[in-house]
Amino acid sequence: MKDTIVAQATPIGRGGVGILRISGPLAQEVAKEVLGKELKPRLANYLPFKDQDGTVLDQGIALFFKAPNSFTGEDVLELQGHGGQVILDILLKRILTIKGIRIARAGEFSEQAFLNDKLDLAQAEAIADLIDATSEQAARSALKSLQGEFSNKINQLVDSVIYLRTYVEAAIDFPDEEIDFLADGKIEGHLNDTIRQLNGVRKEAKQGAILREGMKVVIAGRPNAGKSSLLNALAGREAAIVTNIAGTTRDVLREHIHIDGMPLHIIDTAGLREASDEVEKIGIQRAWDEIEQADHVLLMIDSTEQTAEAFKTEWADFLAKLPQSIPVTVIRNKVDLSGEAEGLQELDGFTLIRLSAQTKVGVDLLREHLKKSMGYQSSTEGGFLARRRHLQALETAAEHLERGHIQLTQFFAGELLAEELRMVQNALSEITGQFTSDDLLGNIFSSFCIGK
C-alpha cells in the first residue's frame, strides 16, 4: 500500500490555529482512530482529538476530502486545532503511532499533486513563489502562475510545435504526394509565427524572473562621477566609502534593497578609465564582468564636465562593448553643482535622469524608473513569475527553433528540421513537467515547506 504522509501545514511556533495535514489511503483511518468516527467529505466537524487511551488531546475542526477531489488527488484529512507547538507535536506523535503513516518530506504534498495531475510543475513551483513573494505584484503574479497562465502559454507553444511536426513528418513519410509541405511556404509561415510567439513568452518570462529573483543593477562610470554616492542614496545608508579622491572604489560593492517590495541587487563598480595601477586594473576588469552580466546598467556622468548631448560620443566605446540586450539608463549626477533641474527625459534612444546623489534630489525619479523597468504596475494586473530554469528551457527551445528555420529555408532538410522540432518540444515540456528528470523533480520539491 502507498504511504500515507502527515505534516504540520502551519508555521512552526505559537499561533492562534495549528493545522496538521494527512494525505494518502489511511486518511480516513486516522479520522476513525483520532476522532472516533468516519467523516463525510467536505463537511466541517467540530470534534475532540483523542489519544490511544481516549484522553482528549485537543479539540477543533476536522475536514475530509475524498480522492480525487483534493489538493493532492488522494484522500486528505486536515485537523485544525489550537496553535500551541506542544499541542501540535503531541497530536502529530499520536498520528504517527498508526501503522503505515510517516512524516512527509519537504514539498511532498505538492509533489503528489503534480504526480496525480492536479497541477503541472510550473504551477507547483508557483506555490513556493507565492509563499516567498516580497511584494503585492510578485504575489499576484505568482497566483497567476498557480492558476495556469504561464502553463497555458507554454502549452500553446507545444501545440504549435506538434502541429509543425505533424506536417514535417508527413512530408518525410509521404514524399510522393502532390503537395510538398516543405516547399509550399506554409510550414515556414507557421514556423515564423511560432518563433514570434516564443520570443514574446521569453520576454514575459525574463520580466517574471526579475520580479521573482530581483534585478541586477550595475552602476558604471568614470572615477569620481558619484557612483558610490548613488549606491548609498539607493540603499539609504553609508554602504560605500565616499571621498573626493578619484578611484576610491577599487572592488565591487553589492547592496540588496527593496523598492516598494521589488527586490534589486545594486552593484557599485570601480571607475572606468585607463589605469596603470595593477590593483585598479583588476577592479576595472571586475567592473566589466559585472556590467556584462547585468539586467540594467546605470551609466553615471558628471553633469559639471559634459553636456547631456555629448554622452553618446564620449561613451561610444563603452556602448559598443556593452551587450545590446542590456538596457542603459544615463544618470546626469551632481545637478546641485551644475545648476540643472532634476528630471527624466528620453534622449537618442536612452532614458536620461538628472539628479544629485549627494542631496538626493531626483533619486525618487530613479527609484520609480527602476520599478517600471522591473515590470511594476500600480494596477492589480500583472504577468506571471518565472524561474531561471524556465528561462534556460525557453532559451534552448529558441535555439533549436532557429536551427530548424535554417534547416528548412537553406537546406530543405526535413529530417533535421523534424529533429530540431522534437528538441523544442522536449525543452518546453520540461517547464510544465511533461518531460522532466527525477533529479530535477527532487531538487524542485525539496525546496518547499514541509507541509506543502
From Swiss-Prot:
Cofactor note: Binds 1 potassium ion per subunit.
Subcellular location: Cytoplasm
Gene Ontology molecular function, alphabetical: GTP binding; GTPase activity; metal ion binding
Domain of life: Bacteria
Residues bound to K(+): N224, T243, I245, T248
Membership in a protein family: Belongs to the TRAFAC class TrmE-Era-EngA-EngB-Septin-like GTPase superfamily. TrmE GTPase family.
HAMAP family linked to this entry: GTPase_MnmE
Quaternary structure annotation from Swiss-Prot or TrEMBL: Homodimer. Heterotetramer of two MnmE and two MnmG subunits.
Protein purpose: Exhibits a very high intrinsic GTPase hydrolysis rate. Involved in the addition of a carboxymethylaminomethyl (cmnm) group at the wobble position (U34) of certain tRNAs, forming tRNA-cmnm(5)s(2)U34.
Protein name: tRNA modification GTPase MnmE
